[in-house]
Amino acid sequence: MRNDADTASMPRVDGDRLWASLERMAQIGATPKGGVCRLALTDLDRESRDLFVQWARDAGCTVRVDRMGNVFARRAGRNPDAAPVMTGSHADSQPTGGRYDGIYGVLGGLEVVRALNDAGIETERPVDVVIWTNEEGSRFAPAMVSAGVFSGVYTLEYGLSRSDGAGRTIGEELERIGYAGAEPVGGYPVHAAYELHIEQGAILERAGKTIGVVTAGQGQRWYEVTLTGVDAHAGTTPMAFRRDALVGAARMISFIEVLGRRYAPDARATVGMIEARPNSRNTVPGGCFFTVEFRHPDDAVLDELDAALRAELARLADETGLGARIEQIFTYAPVPFAPRCIDTVRDAARSLGLSHMDIVSGAGHDACYVARVAPTGMIFVPCVDGLSHNEAEAITPEWATAGADVLLRAVLQSAQEA
């Protein structure tokens, strides 16, 4: 086998083979509207895992499964003791999910292995292609739990004890489908990790770029806000006498929208839930509950958004007489990816002549947890109209091939490093 990574002789993926693999996998859990439903640790998830394992073994990989059910297909390197280069994503989906979310990164990683085999290239380091268990969180909360156990964010006991709506735990379902592995979860060095994924947004498509060089994952802060006024008769209470909690919420929602735009383009400010009380058509609402979510790749900006929200809420209470309570219920720190992995992805896109741009991941991904224990990078390709978590989710064969070619070059470069 060759062991050089000379740019002129770099291998390319077989785009037709990759697309055929994606189409075949999409038959598992296919929905009438063209999407997929493969909830984590269902029989359909098992079927998708079984197919991946078969393909990986056909490509000469050895397969191991850890105690969280994460599946690792290893292509051997010249030095079996060297820390591996890791790539992959997830195979589970939303209930009405798309055909490419997650699985594109898994099968893109498998195509890297196949392309290296086709070219007869022996890498210095092993290459691992991984399926992470329960990335979506649609059946078992929280999302990305198995990558979280791998990176030490959660304990193994916590991960295995997560339950679905019927009370079935991850541990029980892993046993049921035959993917309760014996391998320890994590605890070993990884030289570099790359995750290939659809963007799940419209930035790349609107910018006319084929590749997104992901520089970071956004931090998140979630809040619950309760405003308290006075229930009152809608017909007998003059406007000047009202303490309307819903009107106060409307003012806050408008402020939050303006606040998010003030910190554009990277900020996201969302009110996703609202509940007026008593929720009667002829009663002035005396109570209102709503949620706020902020996202940004810089913790300092998240602090500013937090301070602005609290200040405006205090101002509202002072001016209207409404009671106001705010509770921060979740925080997730921004995740900067490794500069050397970012540079490797960018250089790969440039060497292939592909249009590209730096981008921040608006969604959470397994790579955001892996980045805590290994140098990590991500590669995005566009998706049509930015749709994801939707049965209409779509990418083109050309985008799929381009992203996998970038992944191939990034993995090969890292796998040849001493």
Residues of each region from the PLM?
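Acidic/His- and Gly-rich active-site-bordering loop/insert found
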Residues: 12-98
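Alpha-helical metal-binding/catalytic segments enriched in His/Glu/Asp
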Residues: 25, 87-90, 96-136, 221-227, ...
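A short beta-alpha structural unit
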Residues: 40, 270-279, 291-297, 323-342, ...
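Midchain, well-structured core segments that form catalytic/ion-binding scaffolds
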Residues: 92, 134-135, 139-300
